[in-house]
From Swiss-Prot:
Cofactors: Mn(2+)
Annotated family: Belongs to the arabinose isomerase family.
Entry binding sites for Mn(2+): E306, E333, H349, H448
Biological or metabolic pathway of the protein: Carbohydrate degradation; L-arabinose degradation via L-ribulose; D-xylulose 5-phosphate from L-arabinose (bacterial route): step 1/3
A Pfam family reported for this protein in Swiss-Prot or TrEMBL: AraA_N
Protein source organism: Saccharophagus degradans (strain 2-40 / ATCC 43961 / DSM 17024)
Enzyme Commission number(s) from the entry: 5.3.1.4
HAMAP family: Arabinose_Isome (MF_00519)
Protein name per its UniProtKB record: L-arabinose isomerase
GO biological process: L-arabinose catabolic process to xylulose 5-phosphate
């Protein structure tokens, strides 16, 4: 079983009746073999299901409409084994509301130089059949991924999976529900936004709830459930014995167990896969959830602090896109700088950083929370795993959305941080803090982000194209002046592309 379970990609091959039944039978057989080969690949994370050969406008429309109505089909891979006149594809592609990838390949890798004849040439026409098909996609102004190369090549299979993972993220976005407990942090701008526009653009829903609703869910948690939860904490984390012997510390840990179980029950009942809260809206709760939120993120929930529903949604989407990967994804904030050689960013938050970003065993501690509220709260302490990562910010530009991505290199802190009672990661932005921070600020990037080592820029770009959203990248080659030009050009393009 592939990691995405019943969710699958349909493999559809284009041809026409010009070639006769013998050729079409061979086309169908080869198509089955390619779909099976991709499914069998260790590099492809979902089942690729062959849906046969389409040879007429009606067959094409039928398969596109069938894909639209199949909830387990998250996208299509389209390939022209022979020549397939592209006017036949207009109705189907116009009706298709799921993403598709154009695989420009052919069944055999090498030409049989001594045996090649016109029968071979007529059967293996993707070199020009895919160009005909590509024209109509461009003519229809459709965003799609184009992968070129032999289907058995590892690099091709990896590109296919990049798109598959983006399609899984897009499918998740279409059904995602975000629960907001309380509202945004007062007077904060970037966490605001148009939720109706977001639902139109991304598909996900955002629903607000009073703290009383969540408090009721937490009140239903029994002492037995809390005791069982504490046993899980003992298994999963390092916890000093005095946390359990000190009455106050034990109470703080029990508070987190109650909050975790209460929030999870609430989210499960409403089919919510992401949530936000705010330290300014805690009436009826024992405190700001720390360990509770960290554990929910580690289970796959998206999270955004201070009511940041855009980051919560993207956090969940990226977690789905990176399913099965060892590297993690978390809500994050650029917290403070180390100006040195090189300049570095210490990322953290009040409490809520996901332990999936660390290879070390987290430690549970009870420490004083001094921002917004003053209360002892149990939380996990750990340091992010060194290696390449991406910080992702989704912002509302007023008339549209923008995704900003900054490549960073996470490093081991040069010294221990014994007095810092929160989880953290230390990174060096590419190309430098000076350039990256300036570009981020010019682009309007938030102080919150989704920090991930689980996806790459190609996957994120594929997702942005599926969503029809601008994406700008801050990386090794970024120049601030050129980046500002890109922002200006994009502003014109996206304004005109949506019509006057």
């Amino acid at each position: 079983m592939k990691i995405y379970g019943e969710k699958k990609i349909w493999f559809v091959t284009g041809s026409q009746h010009l070639y006769g039944p013998g050729v079409l039978a061979q086309v169908a057989e080869n198509s089955q073999a390619i779909a099976a080969g991709l499914t069998a690949s260790e590099h492809v994370s979902a089942n690729i299901e062959s849906r046969g050969v389409v040879t007429t406008p009606k067959e094409i429309l039928d398969v596109c409409q069938a894909a639209n109505s199949d909830e387990n089909c998250v996208g299509l891979i389209l390939w022209m084994h022979t020549f397939s006149p592209a006017k036949m594809w207009i109705a189907g592609l116009s009706a298709l509301n799921k993403p598709y990838m154009h695989l420009h390949t052919q069944f055999g890798a090498a030409l049989p130089w001594g045996d090649i004849n016109m029968n071979y040439m007529n059967l293996n026409q993707s070199a020009h059949g895919d160009r005909e098909f590509g024209y109509i996609g461009t003519r229809l102004r459709q965003e799609r991924k184009v992968v070129v190369g032999h289907w058995q090549k590892e690099s091709v299979q990896i590109q296919v999976d990049d798109w598959v993972r983006a399609a899984m993220g897009w499918a998740e976005s279409q059904t995602l529900k975000v629960a907001r407990f309380g509202d945004n942090m007062r007077q904060v701008a970037v966490t605001e936004g148009d939720k109706v526009s977001a639902q139109i653009q991304f598909g996900y829903e955002v629903h607000a709830f009073g703290l009383g609703d969540l408090a009721k869910a937490c009140e239903k948690i029994t002492a037995e459930q809390i005791t069982a939860q504490l046993e899980l904490y003992k298994q999963d984390y390092e916890i000093d014995a005095d946390v359990f012997t000190d009455v106050h510390s034990l109470e703080m840990l029990q508070n987190e167990a109650r909050l975790e179980l209460g929030m999870e029950a609430f989210l499960e009942e409403g089919n919510f896969k992401a949530f936000t809260n705010c330290f300014e809206n805690l009436t009826g709760l024992s405190g700001l959830p720390g360990l509770a939120t960290q554990r929910l993120m580690s289970k796959g929930y998206g999270y955004g602090g201070e009511g940041d529903w855009k980051t919560a949604a993207m956090c969940r989407i990226v977690k789905v896109m990176s399913l099965g990967k060892a590297a993690g994804t978390s809500f994050m904030e650029d917290y403070t700088y180390n100006f040195g050689d090189p300049d570095q960013v210490l990322g953290a938050h009040m409490l809520e950083v996901c332990p999936s970003i660390s290879n070390e065993k987290p430690k549970v501690v009870v420490e004083r929370h001094t921002i917004g509220i003053k209360k002892d709260i149990a939380r996990l302490i750990f340091t992010g795993t060194p290696g390449p990562a991406i910080n992702i910010s989704t912002i509302d530009m007023g008339t549209r959305f923008r995704i900003i991505a900054n490549e960073v290199d996470t490093v081991k802190p040069p010294q221990d941080l014994p007095n810092l009672p929160v989880a953290k990661a230390l990174w060096e932005p590419r190309p430098s803090l000076e350039v990256a921070a300036a570009a981020w600020i010019h682009a309007g990037g938030a102080h919150h982000s989704v920090y991930t080592q689980g996806i790459n820029l190609d996957q994120l770009n594929d997702f942005a194209e599926m969503a029809g959203v601008e994406m700008v990248v801050i990386g090794a080659d970024t120049n601030v002046n050129e980046f500002k030009k890109e922002l200006r050009f994009n502003a014109v393009y996206y304004h005109l592309s949506h019509g006057i």
